[in-house]
Amino acid sequence: LKNDKMKKSILILCVLLMAAIPSACTESHKTPPELDKPQPGPNPDPKPEPSEGKEKMLWFDAEANFQRFSTQAGIIAMLDKTQEAGFNKIVVDVKPVEGDVLYKSEFMTQATTIGSVNVADRGWDYLQFFLDEAHKRNLKVTVSTTVFPMGMPSTRQGPAYRGTTWKGKTCMQYKPEGMVDIKDDPTKVAAFLNPVLPEVQEFALRFIREIVTNYDFDAYALDYCRFPDYQSDFSEASKEAFEKYIGGLVETWPGDVFTYNASGERVPGKYYKEWWEFRSMIIHDFVARVRKEIKAIKPDVKLEYWAASWWGALYANGQNWASKAFRPLTDQDAWSFNSWCSINYHQTGFADQLDTFLLGTYLPRVYGPDDGESIEYGINRAERFLLNACTYYATVDCSQKTFDIEEACYYCLKRTAGLMVFDIVHVINNDMWAAIKRGIDRYEAEAATE
């Protein structure tokens, strides 16, 4: 669903040009930065997984498909094609970064405008219709929401720009030119609320509880459950929370975290490493709260979380999806973590809070054990970092026509417990239905003989 803007490529530029709507692949779902450069290392042999029960998921992004899924006929047609292609589960996005929702809520506003696309009040429950039609086709359903975004700075749309409810609660960015509220920064894809604030967390838990209570589905996926990037949040509230975390006063704010040099590069301060640990612990603790809330309402609903596979860049977003048992500073790639990783950073790992981690191997090549931009490399790394703390599925982006989606689907199913393809808009635009089916069928035929 989010990043630190080291990975600024927008995955579905073609959708913007063709449909003049916001990109399906917003900050949360995008291509990797140059940061993760592998050193030569061992080449783990692929470990076959049992085929029974493996989930093959297709993501239905709310923004990129806003017009397409404005009618029931449009939804039905795509669910039929999804089933025919071999998928057995869908992900339905019901809270895009714009902040309004696509389910029946007692306190959230219905999404009728995203970017330049306007959809009249449907008069029917978008999420319930998806659920009813998916169940008719024996498709499982994951419901996904962005967690902390509440508006789009590029268009100034969303709850963050209406009224005063969220005044002073969106992230305060520390940039080379000074402090800038994220909702006033059109370069950012989403106006994030500050995850540090208790009232923000309570609000997010409220809509999560509402969805889990009122709908019958299989899993809940957290998207954009993170900080926007390294520039956020530097509000007074975050300063006070950080001081409580370290048990002392920060004399120079924000300079004791970092400053900028003349080139706009970060220069670490004395609390640099502790700062990233603090922010990751905020996200860890929130994910743990979400799990507790969901399981208290419906114990069988699984908690899922999507994040990019390039773990070494995600400290800037507070996303430590690794196991607590993983020790970054003794890993083979420790050389690339030393500059920011504290001795206790491993304690912020939240893999053990998840039922399923959706590993964002949104990478251009399938094979290459020493290629940091290959799915194989991303899966090998995840095995080291997750240490069986949770089930995980490899997930792929098929926005590029030249991407070998057939081989990617086959390999992801062979190596991990499941598959997620992002996003249906790419599958449609690139006509990848047949190739996906070939990849799924090849894996299942092979697995049936093992």
Language-model features and meaning:
Residues P50-F69, T142-N214, N261-Y272:
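Active-site-adjacent "subsite" loops/lids of carbohydrate-active enzymes
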Residues F87-V94, Y126-D184, A221-R226, P299-E304:
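Glycine-rich, aromatic-flanked loop segments that form ligand/cofactor-binding clefts
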Residues F87-R122:
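Aromatic-lined carbohydrate-binding/catalytic grooves of carbohydrate-active enzymes
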Residues A20-E52:
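Bacterial Sec-dependent N-terminal signal peptides
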Residues F337-E450:
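Substrate-binding cleft of secreted/luminal carbohydrate-active enzymes
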Residues G151-P153, Y230, I297, K302-Y367, ...:
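Substrate-binding cleft/loops of secretory-pathway carbohydrate-active enzymes
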